[in-house]
């Protein structure tokens, strides 16, 4: 199997090379030439690690001994034996993706990505040091830092928007330990940060960074996206095993969405054979995806809002490019759309393509007040505590269920622990909020009895190690400077 750029199908790479590079030379994203269709029914009988290895082997067939990579990636890192528990809450199900070492769904992929990159490096015969560049809207950063910490032959720089992540998310990153990690705040929003990283990939060559190869831990890297496909199959298998559905029944998934990677993984699962019903795209006040899926017009020329669900505060959803490539198969068309987005800030898809999009995806959005009401209501009725991102998805799922009433089970993806956003959650419960984030954590625990994840509780004792703040125009110079330093 070959991977090809979304913008030029002639630019191909092996699966391992695609994982190593992260992004294609023309700025496009790597996609498999064809998505493999699995004997998904046989997967229903497998444990999570075996299921993961089989799915990833189909997508990345040149990797040897995927089961061993999966075991090493996940061994001892998650707080529950079930990596991604599915729980019944009221009239729907919640897929808990926050049981990993940093309490966010990114752990599922970023526990494994270092294994994939390390083996790809060996397979490609690369002796250069790998420098992982990552832009984060909050959760990817810490998960990537933890995943790549002290991995031999690898360094990682994480950029995050200054003032654009929660206090807990920031504390997770700036206290990060490891001899190969750097964290830097960028004055601007996540889109500025993500665009800066993409420009570095586009502009740097071997002469700029001798002895160094760049790669990415963002979901622009297919090695980050692929492991997320697994938990859709696993959630479906859990429903079958529990007798809630029969094999072949459809299931809807509602996904809080910013960069479109998590929900795209669900579409991959569907294309690989899983009986997915609707994929429901849930946005916060930054509702560029809701508008796009409703009208076919993608327009980033709009006000950027800082919300209580900061990991979704995104106006340029990178993985949407992959979906457009999948639905059209036309690299020149996709390249033209991305050119329009970059140069004039918007594009419009054809009516035919909009119909294809709407045949697969539903959408909705809500603001912070609606999400807060949902947090309070779900706790009062179900004694289930959810974070603001999950609350956005729950609210949009409410809209969908009210409109359709088709009796098909709905799974809400819960992407982060409520303790990553304790101020927003405690406030939503009608409680007074202190200035100190750790005091708020304690108050939230006292109010609900829900345990604080150990990795978050321990943050209050950790010293700050990373204090760099730069302008977005200085990101390239920062990378060149740090890449040239022997010791971090």
Q: Which sequence ranges carry the predicted segments?
A:
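PLP-dependent amino-acid enzyme catalytic core
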Residues: 1-488
């Amino acid at each position: 199997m070959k991977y090809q750029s979304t913008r030029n199908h002639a630019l191909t790479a092996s699966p391992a090379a695609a994982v190593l590079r992260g992004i294609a030379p023309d700025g496009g994203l790597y996609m498999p030439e064809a998505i493999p269709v699995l004997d998904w029914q046989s997967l229903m009988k497998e444990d999570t690690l075996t299921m993961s290895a089989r799915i990833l082997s189909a997508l990345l067939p040149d990797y040897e001994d995927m089961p061993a990579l999966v075991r090493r990636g996940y061994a001892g890192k998650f707080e529950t034996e079930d990596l991604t528990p599915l729980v019944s809450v009221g009239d729907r199900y919640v897929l808990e993706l926050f049981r990993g070492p940093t309490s966010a769904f990114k752990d599922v992929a970023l526990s494994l990505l270092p294994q994939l990159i390390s083996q790809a490096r060996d397979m490609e015969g690369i002796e250069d040091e790998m420098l992982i560049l990552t832009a984060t809207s909050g959760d990817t950063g810490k998960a990537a830092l933890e995943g790549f910490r002290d991995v031999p032959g690898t360094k990682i720089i994480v950029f995050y928007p200054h003032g654009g992540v929660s206090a807990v998310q920031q504390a997770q990153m700036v206290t990060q330990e490891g001899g190969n990690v750097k964290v830097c705040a960028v004055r601007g929003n996540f889109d500025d940060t993500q665009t800066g990283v993409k420009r570095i990939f586009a502009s740097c060559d071997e002469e700029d960074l001798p002895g160094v190869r760049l790669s990415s831990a963002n979901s622009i890297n297919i090695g980050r996206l692929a492991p997320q496909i697994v938990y859709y199959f696993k959630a479906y298998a859990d429903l079958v095993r529990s007798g809630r559905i029969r094999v072949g029944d459809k299931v809807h998934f509602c996904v809080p969405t910013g960069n479109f990677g998590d929900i795209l993984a669900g579409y991959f699962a569907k294309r690989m054979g899983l009986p997915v019903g609707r994929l429901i795209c849930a946005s916060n006040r930054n509702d560029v995806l809701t508008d796009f899926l409703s009208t076919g017009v993608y327009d980033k020329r709009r006000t950027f809002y800082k919300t209580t669900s900061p990991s979704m505060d995104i106006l340029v959803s990178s993985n949407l490019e992959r979906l457009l490539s999948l639905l059209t198969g036309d690299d020149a068309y996709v390249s033209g759309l991305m050119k329009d987005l970059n140069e004039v800030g918007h594009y419009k898809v054809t009516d035919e393509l909009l119909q294809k999009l709407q045949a697969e995806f539903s959408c909705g959005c809500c603001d912070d007040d609606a999400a807060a009401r949902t947090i309070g209501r779900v706790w009062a009725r179900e004694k289930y505590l959810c974070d603001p991102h999950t609350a956005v998805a729950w609210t949009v799922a409410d809209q969908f269920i009210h409109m359709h009433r088709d009796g098909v089970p709905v799974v809400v993806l819960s992407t982060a622990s409520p303790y990553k956003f304790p101020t927003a959650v405690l406030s939503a419960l009608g409680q007074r909020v202190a200035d100190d984030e750790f005091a708020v954590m304690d108050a939230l625990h006292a109010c609900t009895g829900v345990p604080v994840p150990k990795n978050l509780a321990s943050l209050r004792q950790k010293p700050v190690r990373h204090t760099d703040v730069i302008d977005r125009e200085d990101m390239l110079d920062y990378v060149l400077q740090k890449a040239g330093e022997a010791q971090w």
